[in-house]
Amino acid sequence: MSAALLEISGCYRTFQAGEQQLTVLKDVNLTIERGEMVAIVGASGSGKSTLMNILGCLDKPSKGAYFINGQDTSTMDADELAQLRREHFGFIFQRYHLLSDLTAIGNVEVPAVYAGKERSARKDRAEHLLTRLGLGDRLDHKPNQLSGGQQQRVSVARALMNGGDVILADEPTGALDSHSGEEMMQLLQELHSDGHTIIIVTHDMNVAQYADRIIEIKDGIIISDERKTKAPKHVDTAVTKINNRIRVASWDRYVEAFKMALLAMSTHRLRTFLTMLGIIIGIASVVSVVALGEGSQREILNSISSMGTNTIDIRPGFGFGDRRSGKVKTLIVKDADALKHLPYVDSVTPTVDSSMTLRYGNKAVTTVVNGVGPEFFRVRGYELAMGQFWDEDSVSSLAQDAVIDDKVRKELFPRSSPIGEVIFIGNLPVRIIGVTEPKDSVFGKSDSLNVWLPYTTLSGRIVGKNYLNGITVRLNESVPSNAAEQGIITLLKMRHGIEDFFTINTDAIRQNIEKTTATMTLLISAIAVISLIVGGIGVMNIMLVSVTERTREIGVRMAVGARQSDILRQFLIEAVLVCLCGGTLGIALAYLIGVVFAQTGGSFQMIYSTTSIVAAFACSTLIGVLFGFLPARNAARLDPVDALARE
């Protein structure tokens, strides 16, 4: 003989009310066979709703046992009970409990989503059920666009979506007018005729008369159990053993959770935007700071490169600001010649400079006249705008050939080409053979005018001195600059007998600037990250509020079969989505800041790196997961009975 469909034995249900315990059900024993139509009648507070919650696996007895087709529910966990509700029970609530953001067909589909049904299959079935119940022209209407009777029919269709072997109707006519109530009871009788087990919970004896069996409960005790007809013979169609598996279309769960998250966000647009604001500001700050740091670093390094790549400058004296450096005359051309023979040296250019008056026609300007070697322009990264540079022969012959910069050209030759023209440096006539492209110094734009001559010409024909103002050494690319610098210092100390000079290693400067910029970027980014954390706390706060506001929705979802993991997933996806949208808007804001920065005359461009953008998205996701987990977990742990009772 097969077991009864539903069997409660020795059931007690006790609740804690302050310091006292309130026993709502007392030693309830009840058996319901498959195919019965049962009415449980009782006054308010009699325990009938608590009994229905236990029958529908929304609650568990405090003491006693509840068997479904012979399976003891006391050993089942929350997800196993959810599967029973999902696949074998259908609920019809007095207040309908439809999800306000979903259409009629969307509400009916919800149980099938959690059952893992394919999208097309569940849509077809939902449409079929609604059409069968006379709502074929209301498929896309939301609950607030439907009458009370129509909303109740939607809840009936939802109860039938996954089969609804057992239909639990809680005061099904309580919120309906008499005509709609009559139609609802006739509909329940039709479902009973189709083989569904119907359990009606009501306080109205007139409603109970539609059932074949009336159970009266008072003060938690069943006081009568009357059958109007014989119990139907139960068919051997056992309830599926609980294995907590997903049947098909598991990916649809994520898609539906994503859709519900979008719906929740669009319903509260302003609140969602304000929640995102902390994330937007934090992400925009981090990305902008990194872009500013990268842009400024690249600008500075480009300026340093203008001093020469992999170069070491040698100057007389004991360091910058040394007043005695002008009296040090030991740096000579032979030092430069000696440095050329070092194996790690690529090229050497001596430097002599002097401030002098330059004349052309009736125009006179004060310029810095630089005596340099032919390698100077390559070492310093100068490029020709017109003309040519001189060569070794010019140095050997003390050639009176000059290269001028663009500022000199603009001063003396604003409308004509200077190539081939003769100018006077002091009293020495020189011919202009080249003009360099405009170039900024490492410290920004310079107003000084520059003319370059062979160092032999400046030393021998103009200033008449046999010592140098400096030497620039270009190293081979494969040589560590610090080691080469020490070798140069050692050689010159041996030649001079004293270290009466100092060196400027451009690579060392570059490395120091890179370290400093990285440190500053990290420091400012750390400050910006604080706003991200504040934004994350804001997300958590709003999500906690959202869970409180949507408690009844969570209860409905649990009643139709949502597992704890389904609820957790939905709220977690919502939190992550809020943060990802905030991250996207933050990155867009960072780019907008870059455009404004460029338009307002910034001295360099903000450079956005793919790494920082990817990191921003990763950070947004992480914040969503970290700060969204607590609200999502709270939602998943709600008791379905308490959640449904919450207004």
UniProtKB/Swiss-Prot annotation:
GO cellular component, as recorded: plasma membrane
| Top-rank EC class of the record's enzyme | translocase
Which Gene3D superfamilies does the UniProt record give?
P-loop containing nucleotide triphosphate hydrolases
Q: Does this entry carry the keyword Metal-binding?
A: no
List where this protein forms a coiled coil: none
Q: Which residues bind ATP?
A: G42, A43, S44, G45, S46, G47, K48, S49
Recorded superkingdom: Bacteria
Listed SMART domains:
AAA
Q: Set out the biological process GO terms recorded for this chain's protein.
A: response to antibiotic
What InterPro entries does the annotation carry? AAA+_ATPase (IPR003593), ABC3_permease_C (IPR003838), ABC_transporter-like_ATP-bd (IPR003439), ABC_transporter-like_CS (IPR017871), MacB-like_ATP-bd (IPR017911), MacB_PCD (IPR025857), Macrolide_Exporter_MacB (IPR050250), P-loop_NTPase (IPR027417)
Q: How does it sit in the membrane?
A: Multi-pass membrane protein
A single Gene Ontology MF term assigned here is: ATP hydrolysis activity
Question: Where is this protein primarily located?
Answer: membrane
**Protein location:** Cell inner membrane
Record's keyword terms, sorted: Antibiotic resistance, ATP-binding, Cell inner membrane, Cell membrane, Membrane, Nucleotide-binding, Translocase, Transmembrane, Transmembrane helix, Transport
State which residue ranges cross the membrane. Answer: 273-293, 522-542, 577-597, 612-632
Biological function: Part of the tripartite efflux system MacAB-TolC. MacB is a non-canonical ABC transporter that contains transmembrane domains (TMD), which form a pore in the inner membrane, and an ATP-binding domain (NBD), which is responsible for energy generation. Confers resistance against macrolides.
Q: Which PANTHER family match?
A: MACROLIDE EXPORT ATP-BINDING_PERMEASE PROTEIN MACB, MEMBRANE COMPONENT OF TRANSPORTER-RELATED
How does the annotation summarize its subunit structure? Homodimer. Part of the tripartite efflux system MacAB-TolC, which is composed of an inner membrane transporter, MacB, a periplasmic membrane fusion protein, MacA, and an outer membrane component, TolC. The complex forms a large protein conduit and can translocate molecules across both the inner and outer membranes. Interacts with MacA.
Query: Hey, which family's this protein in?
Result: Belongs to the ABC transporter superfamily. Macrolide exporter (TC 3.A.1.122) family.
Q: What is this protein called?
A: Macrolide export ATP-binding/permease protein MacB
Recite the lineage of the species: Bacteria, Pseudomonadati, Pseudomonadota, Gammaproteobacteria, Alteromonadales
